[in-house]
């Protein structure tokens, strides 16, 4: 199958790109600039595309992102520290983000005669993000079948949707993903902060997978206290 991967430049989507390149015909990576404070992630998506020898397209959604207010990822709000599953992390929701991005990705995929769009949502996303859950994935596929009926048959692949981030680390290691060439931190500083929800989840995932974490964190040990009382699991 010819696959277009939605790639932010993060650990999950870069690992997915490597998996798709190994198992199918990867025709390109598509990324989105929606005004996120951690825009440097897009540089890591570009690195992945160059390494894999495929085109990389960045869709400018900054005008749209400016209207999706109330998120710490796009507004002048503090990104909270702590575990990814805490209620405080809801401030990182960008409303309807995946639905908007996927609608664009499906249009691009149809135009490029791709067979599928691949997305790296995973079980750990379910706590906070409704557009990362299996129900959303299934419903979006049905909607797109109607939207492209008679024009194109594009599938939505979400192979990580029911597994943990630790499982993604295992998959990435299997396919040789250079984890030091991925970006997760929502704060978008010079180094991974080690304290925001996505840094904590990243650090925990390497630990649970038994894979060496090459990431340079400002606070490499915060994850231990942040994850106490939580149990990473498949959802």
From Swiss-Prot:
ATP binds at residues 7-17. Signal peptide: none annotated. The keyword Nucleotide-binding applies. One of its GO terms (molecular function) is ligase activity, forming carbon-nitrogen bonds. It catalyses: 7-carboxy-7-deazaguanine + NH4(+) + ATP = 7-cyano-7-deazaguanine + ADP + phosphate + H2O + H(+). Pfam families: QueC (PF06508). Belongs to the QueC family. This is 7-cyano-7-deazaguanine synthase.
């Amino acid at each position: 199958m010819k696959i277009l991967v939605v790639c932010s430049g993060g650990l999950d989507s870069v690992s997915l790109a490597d998996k798709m390149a190994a198992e199918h015909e990867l025709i390109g990576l598509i990324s989105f600039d929606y005004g996120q404070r951690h825009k440097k992630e897009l540089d890591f998506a570009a690195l992945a595309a160059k390494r894999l020898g495929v085109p990389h397209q960045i869709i400018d959604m900054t005008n749209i992102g400016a209207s999706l207010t109330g998120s710490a990822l796009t507004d002048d709000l503090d990104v909270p520290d702590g575990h990814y599953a805490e209620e405080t992390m809801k401030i990182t929701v960008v409303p309807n983000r995946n639905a908007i991005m996927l609608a664009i990705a499906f249009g691009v995929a149809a135009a490029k005669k791709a067979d599928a769009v691949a997305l790296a949502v995973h079980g750990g996303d379910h706590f906070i993000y409704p557009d990362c859950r299996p129900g959303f994935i299934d419903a979006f596929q049905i909607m797109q079948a109607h939207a492209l009926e008679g024009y194109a048959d594009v599938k939505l692949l979400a192979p990580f949707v029911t597994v943990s981030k630790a499982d993604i680390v295992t998959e990435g290691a299997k396919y040789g993903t250079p984890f030091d060439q991925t970006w997760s931190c929502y704060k978008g500083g010079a180094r991974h902060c080690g304290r925001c929800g996505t840094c904590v989840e990243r650090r925990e995932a390497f630990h649970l997978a038994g894979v060496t974490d090459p990431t340079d964190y400002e606070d490499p040990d915060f994850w231990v206290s942040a994850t106490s009382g939580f149990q990473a699991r498949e959802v």
